């Protein structure tokens, strides 16, 4: 009985470890892809646990990072946790389908898994297109690199008038980069 519980527990930790490594791979891939410059104006859609937020705000000197998340609780939690280290970053409550910023505010927008889970992805992509400056870049990460999902997102981005689409693959995840 004890061996059975230990076996189940070790399976859990193996799965957790694999998921954690994949998450870190995706986060590093996104940060590398964005190529953060000190004066960038960046929008993060979905703050997650705040690790990418912290990494980016450390690199920005004159620029800014704004993050929106649909969870009010998460916005409060991340704001409190990073109160001293916010630097050039701010966290707001908001949805990808209704981004609370003016047209052409950001030169870079990125999403780690959040846009995929929104209720109307076409509306979310339209909003992202609206807040991006001309020649601004949108970065979206996708968990699996299945061809069907990749083709679907590329077509959705093309339908919203994004151009110069490129795909960056690493491990079992990919990042699609699109230009306004």
Swiss-Prot record:
Q: Using the UniProt record, name the top-level EC class of this enzyme in a single word.
A: transferase
Family, per the entry?
Belongs to the methyltransferase superfamily.
* Taxonomic placement: Bacteria, Bacillati, Bacillota, Bacilli, Bacillales
Keyword Methyltransferase among record annotations: yes
GO annotation (BP), single: methylation
Query: What induces its synthesis?
Result: By the natural cationic antimicrobial peptide LL-37 and the synthetic cationic antimicrobial peptide poly-L-lysine (PLL).
- Supply the name of the protein: Putative methyltransferase YrhH
GO molecular function per UniProt: methyltransferase activity; S-adenosylmethionine-dependent methyltransferase activity
Family annotation (Pfam families): Methyltransf_11
| Species this chain originates from | Bacillus subtilis (strain 168)
Q: What CDD domains does this protein's entry cite?
A: AdoMet_MTases (cd02440)
- Keyword set for this entry? Methyltransferase, Stress response, Transferase
What the entry lists under SUPFAM superfamilies is as follows: S-adenosyl-L-methionine-dependent methyltransferases (SSF53335)
Q: What is its EC number?
A: 2.1.1.-
